[in-house]
Curated annotation (Swiss-Prot):
The lineage of its organism: Bacteria, Bacillati, Actinomycetota, Actinomycetes, Mycobacteriales. The gene is mbtN. It comes from Mycolicibacterium paratuberculosis (strain ATCC BAA-968 / K-10) (Mycobacterium paratuberculosis). This is Acyl-[acyl-carrier-protein] dehydrogenase MbtN. Catalyzes the dehydrogenation at the alpha-beta position of ACP-bound acyl chains. This results in the introduction of a double bond in the lipidic chain, which is further transferred to the epsilon-amino group of lysine residue in the mycobactin core by MbtK. The keyword RNA-binding does not apply. InterPro entries: Acyl-CoA_dehydrogenase, Acyl-CoA_Oxase/DH_mid-dom, Acyl-CoA_Oxase/DH_mid-dom_sf, AcylCo_DH-like_C, AcylCo_DH/oxidase_C, AcylCoA_DH/ox_N, AcylCoA_DH/ox_N_sf, AcylCoA_DH/oxidase_NM_dom_sf. GO terms for cellular component: cytoplasm. Keywords: FAD, Flavoprotein, Oxidoreductase.
């Protein structure tokens, strides 16, 4: 897949500018106050063409548009809203590539139009990110599949219509506890969504456990046993790229607002910005956020979704984002600690999700490590073949 042209990206930016209007800002403010995700926001973005324009090129994502949407979400400075929309879009990515039946295509098209909301049910209490040992079971019956299990962290499940469920097929080995991973779409109406969790941050991102004990038709199968990990990994790579883009934009907004504070707040006869230590600390953060933006642009220019690059840029962005929000909150001083006076405390709490959601730092570093290549020839040339 080729990278989007400048004209394509410019057009998509225009679409985003029209869609992310005052109504979206108001829904975001209300969502932060109510700690609930507004389904109408996804409906609005779908109706305004945000998803259809992004997916008009085919079954693979336009990475440039993926990054632009992520930046628009990041500028909202609401992790709950940003991650919620990107999870819906990541489920679309999975269906767009792997959903072959008319049933799945219909779900996908309705999700793109904003007429259906999607979520992903992967992690369980038993294994977290280790999806090889999922306990949710899938078995064939009557031209379809029985699905039984409990998913612990299913964001958007309280408002979603369909869950992309990671399950383990037990058709050929009922005692199996590892592997045979599949992916299947389950209507939320056929599952039991529990009470949403109280969380440290990202309040509007309604996240709950989901209990599943139902039957679905064969047409609901997204990825057969043995290919489910590949399918969900594709969706996770999409989500990781989005998280990185959201962080880049939210960090830039936080830095800009903090700089404004530094240029108006005076201590010891000078503005905070005139104090060299503070000014250079912010310059260091700005330089690294700029590098993150350039990295995202570089990945987008390749024109394809690269699983290893997505893992690397997400973990790097998450750790940088945590530092940026912490430093900005620090520079605000006591006001940064007052939740009714500034949003810095909320932004700081929200950013913690980035180091866990979509894969922890350690899981993502393992993906990066798996693709590293040793330079044996270079080693021999500088150290010598006989050295231990």
């Amino acid at each position: 897949m080729s990278a989007a042209t400048t004209a394509d990206i410019d057009h998509y930016r225009t679409v985003l500018a029209g869609a992310f209007d005052d109504q979206v800002l108001e829904w975001t403010r209300e969502a932060e106050a109510r700690q609930r995700f507004p389904r109408e926001l996804i409906e609005h973005l779908g109706a305004r063409g945000v998803f259809s324009e992004k997916w008009c090129g085919g079954m693979l994502p336009d990475v440039g548009k993926l990054v632009e949407l992520a930046r628009a979400l990041g500028r909202l400075s609401s992790a709950g809203i940003g991650v919620g929309v990107s999870l819906h879009d990541s489920a679309i990515a999975v269906l767009r590539r792997f959903g072959k039946s008319d049933y799945l295509r219909d779900i996908c098209e309705r999700a793109i139009a904003g007429q259906a909301v999607l979520c992903i049910g992967a992690s369980e209490e038993s294994g977290g990110s280790d999806l090889q040992i999922v306990r949710t079971e899938m078995s064939s019956r009557d031209g379809g599949f029985d699905i039984r299990g409990v998913k612990k962290f299913v964001s958007l499940s309280p408002i979603a219509d369909h869950i992309m469920v990671v399950a383990r097929s037990i058709d050929h080995d009922s005692a199996s506890k590892h592997g045979n991973v599949a992916l299947i779409a389950v209507p939320t109406s056929q599952a039991s969504v529990q009470r949403p969790y109280a969380k440290v941050g990202a309040g509007p991102l309604d996240t709950a456990a989901v209990h599943i004990d139902t039957w679905v038709p064969a047409d609901a199968l997204v990825a057969r046993a043995g290919t489910g990990l590949a399918a969900i990994s594709w969706g996770l790579a999409h989500e990781r790229m989005s998280i990185a883009g959201q962080i880049a934009a939210s960090c830039q907004r936080a830095i800009g607002i903090t700089l404004a504070r530094m240029m108006t707040r005076r201590q010891f006869g000078r503005t905070l910005f005139e104090h060299q230590a503070l000014r250079l600390r912010m310059a260091d953060l700005q330089a690294r956020v700029d590098l993150l933006q350039h990295g995202l642009n570089g990945i987008a220019a390749q024109g394809r979704l690269d699983l290893r690059a997505a893992a690397g840029v997400k973990v790097t962005a998450a750790r940088l984002g945590e530092e940026v929000m912490s430093e900005c909150m620090h520079i605000f001083g006591g006001a940064g600690y007052l939740v009714e006076e500034t949003p810095l405390g909320r932004w700081w709490r929200d950013m913690k999700l980035a180091r866990v959601g979509g894969g922890t730092d350690e899981v993502l570093w393992e993906l990066v490590a798996a693709g590293m290549a040793a330079d044996h020839g270079g080693y021999r040339s500088v150290v010598g073949a006989s050295s231990a």
